[in-house]
């Protein structure tokens, strides 16, 4: 933020070094990653100094963190969890405290320590459970670089911060720099962080909370709890606003004329033409989000989680995604970025219908329904101009080809 003084920057750097050292010492002591640690506090508590002082920002230093940067200096406290958290202290006590010589007594002692595993202070999520681009995990509370028990809202706010910082860089440049290389590098770093936070939001869709905690008093309590329909729907709404809608990337407009990297050899083919490749970069980011939302693992999970509480059906999920990609300019002028996005989405739906695809018959049926619905909308729409009309005809042609192929 603009309020970061030299003193605050030094504080941030010191805390990051403290985090790095504590994290690696934790590994030396046998601690694995705990990617549920950062979900310890509520979003509002991240700016409360008394809570930070007593509990920390995370229950574990073994997570991967993003810095907590407030919009104002008055609300800025710690930036990162830089010392062992409550989970770490508990796990280390279990492994290193002095035990009893009697094996039966020692077993009971360790069982007593482990019995507090279900309290929030001791929440744990390992690498293989983490929800990320690979879709290896499906609990949205177990993610890398997320923050708070409301990660979608933290990430939404972080994306808004990135927009402001990016626009400020475009207006003022990098102080003391005559070359645009540093501006180029910083804008790219911000752009990558924007995507990371969008993926954290996307993890809510089809998300299922789970726990392996052993509960003696209630062995039949649910181990899988789907994310509420409201939260999943809101996640798509946030993605619509920040990634899919027309103008979602307008915050970058002023930076495009300055995005010229220094020439450093000839090995990187990406820089051969020197231009900032606006449409390619933005489509690439949108593709990553669609990779997450339309992955066969995720879509099948949405279907299966309906058997244990998920009320956000596959048809509703795909309909909301279709609305996010088509509704805003159905009868309005359409820009190149939205053209690319709409074509990309239709191609993905087409691939879902292929006979040898990874998608189940249930998912293929839902994709088929979406294609019919989109084609109906496009045919009814009054194109804003000839360019929009040609684009819509191209989409209709692609849908018709895919449908006729299935027949």
Language model segments and positions:
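Short pre-active-site segment immediately N-terminal to the catalytic Zn-binding motif
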Residues: 2-21
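Active-site recognition of the HExxH zinc-binding catalytic motif
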Residues: 19-34
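Active-site and adjacent substrate-binding regions of carbohydrate-active enzymes
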Residues: 13, 31-32, 40-41
